[in-house]
Regions:
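Beta1/beta-strand and adjacent pyrophosphate-binding region of the FAD-binding site
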Residues: 5-20
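A conserved beta-strand/loop capping segment in the N-terminal third of enzymes
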Residues: 58, 62-112
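Conserved Rossmann-like nucleotide-cofactor binding loop
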Residues: 20, 43, 167
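Conserved hydrophobic helix-helix packing surfaces used for dimerization/oligomerization
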Residues: 12-14, 35, 293
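Glycine-rich FAD pyrophosphate-binding loop
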Residues: 29-49
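Predominantly flavin-linked oxidoreductase catalytic cores and closely associated redox partners
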Residues: 116-264
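FAD/FMN-dependent oxidoreductases across multiple families
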Residues: 226, 242-324, 332-333
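C-terminal helical "tail/cap" subdomain of flavin- and related membrane-associated enzymes
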Residues: 323-418
Length: 418
């Protein structure tokens, strides 16, 4: 629906139609709410992303009814991890989650999940950029939008869900603040034609070298998109903190990494559609909720500090936030919900990610970690967000214990109120 035909009021207004926002709109509509799903873009549109879908993300897509659809795309068995003289093929562990992952370009994925939201009853609103809010005391009563002609209009709402991505412009209006004292990501990706677009393993190179051969605190990836696509998503990501900035030229690094993989992956031609982004990670944001509004997905910093993945968290938070709708005040309830689901894991993960930015840590720890298949299997499970509260094995118990201890040491735990 174009902005000119926008409804003047709704029960639930969702701003941002990525995976998180569209999931929230779908679940809210299925729960019987009147929903408007707004986005600044006109779909289909691209987003900077590695396009990888972990088994946890596949499980959420199953719940939305997209299981058959996603399995009709690339299907991978696990991770091929390489670096420091070693290479391992590490299958997804299965168990509570599917034993496979996928990779779907965001242009296609986001459009399809948005269709599910619309089919569930949400009203779409395209080309509408949220620029301000109206309030009555501590409640948001309406969002002010601008259309393509810079004409303003408003949509009144009883509940507001903000899913406008890593930059979260509407979140900033509402008081969201990103704290860069813990690790954040600096990443770039593009697409290349590859003779191995149907490879059954996503690949990560954990010994990422800069254009001068220097070791960087990050990794490179190659995610096959399937034989029909004929392409792979190729990218690089590094970690940084306010004290230890990344200091890399992403475009040059992406080109160098692509050239290094060219023969191995039978890559032809230049990188297509290169794009980059900064990624707040591990709940390193404050101001994620108010009386009748909440931030979800990337806007809330729900990104894994160890690999930059956020689609599964986006889909989950889009589903979980609907449980708040009967509460009168979300300002404390939503941060508490996020901490309950992700706080411990985010705390220890961003602490480990911060260590990787220390110059001497990775050269010492990298070769030791890559030597052990058992250790890398544990790393896959942790990096893939595949440890749940229901798991009772040694790895799960150790990870949760480490997370609880880490939170106690945090100056600013994940999802702090201010």
């Amino acid at each position: 629906m174009p902005a000119a035909a926008a409804p003047s009021a709704t029960d639930v207004l969702v701003v941002g139609a990525g995976p998180a926002g569209s999931a929230a709109a779908a679940w809210a509509a299925r729960a019987g709410h009147d929903v408007v799903l707004a986005d600044a873009a006109v779909f289909p549109r691209d987003k900077t992303c590695g396009d990888g879908l972990t088994p946890r993300a596949i499980a959420e897509l199953d719940l939305l009814g997209l299981g058959d659809w996603v399995r009709g795309h690339a299907r991978n068995r696990g991770l091929r991890a390489a670096g420091f003289g070693h290479e391992w093929q590490l299958p997804w562990p299965g168990g509570r989650f599917p034993d496979h992952g996928s990779a779907v370009p965001r242009t296609e994925l986001d459009a399809r999940i948005r269709e599910v939201a619309i089919d569930s009853g949400a009203t779409p609103l395209d080309g509408a950029r949220a620029v301000d809010v109206e309030r009555d005391g501590d409640r948001v009563t309406a969002v002010v939008f601008e259309d393509a002609d810079d004409e303003q209009f408003r949509v009144a709402c009883r509940r507001l869900v903000v899913a406008d991505g890593v930059r979260s412009p509407l979140g900033r209006v509402l008081g969201r603040e990103w704290h860069r004292d813990t690790a954040f990501g600096v990443a770039a990706r593009g697409y290349v034609t590859s003779g191995r677009s149907d490879d059954e393993w996503i690949s990560s190179h954990l010994e990422l070298r800069g254009v001068e051969g220097e070791l960087l605190s990050g990794y490179g990836w190659v995610f096959p998109l399937g034989a029909a696509a004929g392409e792979v998503n190729i990218g690089v990501g590094t970690l940084a903190t306010a004290r230890r900035p990344a200091g890399v030229q992403l475009k040059a690094l992406l080109e160098a990494y692509t050239d290094a993989r060219r023969e191995e992956w039978q890559i032809h031609g230049p990188v297509r559609a290169p794009a980059s982004a900064l990624l707040p990670m591990g709940g390193a944001v404050s101001g994620v909720a108010g009386r009748n509004w909440a931030l979800i997905g990337d806007a809330a910093g729900c990104v894994n500090p160890l690999n930059g993945e956020g689609i599964d968290y986006g889909l989950e938070t889009g589903r979980i936030v609907v449980d708040l709708f009967d509460d009168d005040d979300w300002s404390a309830a939503w941060p508490a919900t996020l901490r309950r689901h992700y706080g411990h894991a985010f705390s220890i993960a961003r602490r480990l990610a911060g260590l990787l930015t220390v110059p001497r840590f990775l050269p010492a720890a990298g070769p030791v970690g890559m030597r052990s298949r058992a250790l890398m299997t544990v790393a896959l499970r942790v990096m893939g967000n595949l440890v749940t509260e229901e798991d009772r094995d040694v790895v799960a118990r150790a990870w949760r214990t480490a997370g609880r201890l880490s939170v106690k040491l945090d100056d600013r735990p994940p999802f702090t109120a201010k």
